[in-house]
Amino acid sequence: MGQYRKERYLLKQKLKKYKFTILIYHNIFTYFIFKIFKFDEYKNVKMRDLVFKTMDRKEVYKNMLSSKYLLDDTDVNQEGLTQRVFDSLILEKKLITTNSNIKSYDFYDENNILIINRDNPIIAKEFLESEYKKIPEKIIKQYAIENWVKKLLEE
């Protein structure tokens, strides 16, 4: 689940062959305004590829729990981690991401995290079929909000 961005929508189209369910939210009012006024970006955007009902955090969490993989599609210029990365760690879900900087983190494991190119996303069958490799609790705990606050207060 993610907010509509042109790059995210295009990535969803490129990933259709893998038959993933990728939810992209868009405000229905602005969608129709952009379609009526024929914004170029919306020329090929189909209503059926979007979700117009917002989900609360509980619904999003429920969807993530029932998923085998989570998609982390970062903004083009983003370098840091998104909430989706932490969700995948806590829920022990495999992560498919466009963020190549994730390799530098101690929790990175190519068995659990697949880095894709947004222009030509290729997802190996082996990645999809292999089991999630548990990350040590010690590593996960250091990314908990309580730990971040503790580190800030110590500085």
Indicate residue ranges for each PLM-predicted region:
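Nucleotide-sugar donor-binding catalytic core of glycosyltransferases
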Residues: M1-Q78, T82, T98-I102, I145-E155
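Pol beta-like nucleotidyltransferase catalytic core
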Residues: K14-L15, M47-R48, L70, I90, ...
